[in-house]
Amino acid sequence: MQPTLSTAPDGTRFRDLNGNGVMDPYEDPRLTPEERTADLLARLSLEEKAGLMFQTVIELGDDGDLLETPGAISKSPTSTVILGKGMSHFNVHHIPTARAGARWSNNLQRLAEQTPHGIPVTISTDPRHAFVENTGVAFSAGPFSQWPEPMGLAALDDLEVIRTFADVARQEYCAVGIRAALHPQIDLPTEPRWGRQAQTSGYDAERVSQITAAYLEGFQGDALGPESVACTTKHFPGGGPQRDGEDAHFPYGREQDYPGGMFEYHLAPFREAIRRGTAGMMPYYGMPVGLERDGRPIDEVGFAYNRQIVTDLLREELGFDGVVVTDWELVN
């Protein structure tokens, strides 16, 4: 069932998302997002709530059609994950043309309108405005404008260029229905052998903090709004000090060392991201080794599972109240 544009008795126009002929509070455009969300949550089943807690990879069909077979990476048909599993957050991979991207996004939203409460889909993406083509890390620009990698942008040493890039990328994302960015990556690569440096902005904590502020301003604006692209900043609390330069995507690269009290140095850009209102935060796959804060040992447990890191530090000490997004397939 597709929702209809209806008129309430008082003349308010609204979209009847659940098709019951009544303007329920979550459909009332006059209410705040918080009020509408509270009403919607009270209507959802446990299964529907569970579906909203996951985000998976999704792929386009030919020329923007919905892919109804398993893809190269996505494991289920599109209708299965939306109508069957109640999922509404997806990380899009290859987009061949802007037309296909926009057409696919519209098709996806029309499918989501058939769910019991008409919850729209949120599409996210890894960086896709530069040259690197490495699935799970970044995509080359393709139909989007092409810019230097983040390390190259940082090397220009011009915050206005960073802000302009982010604003242009925001507009291009919105044009094809992408409203969430799985970036910026603000890790400080203090281990020069680490293989994920190209998507960082270097190892100067103060300068990276300034770049982060400009980046978030370009994508999100002064505050999240209808024209924003919501950013998920990564990889909390800093994914750069990888032991021997290995990477935590692999079991042999999970250890992160902070010699000489460098943990706070790596944390500095994330403090700025929180101050600037980043919508999301992504912990890394890695785990701290031999780390103490204020004389208290930090458990040698993966950051995304680490209560001392996610709850005590990120939520309580730093006051982050946005969405925590785990890195991909943390549980599989």
What do these predicted regions represent?
Residues 1-332:
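Glycoside hydrolase catalytic-domain context in secreted enzymes
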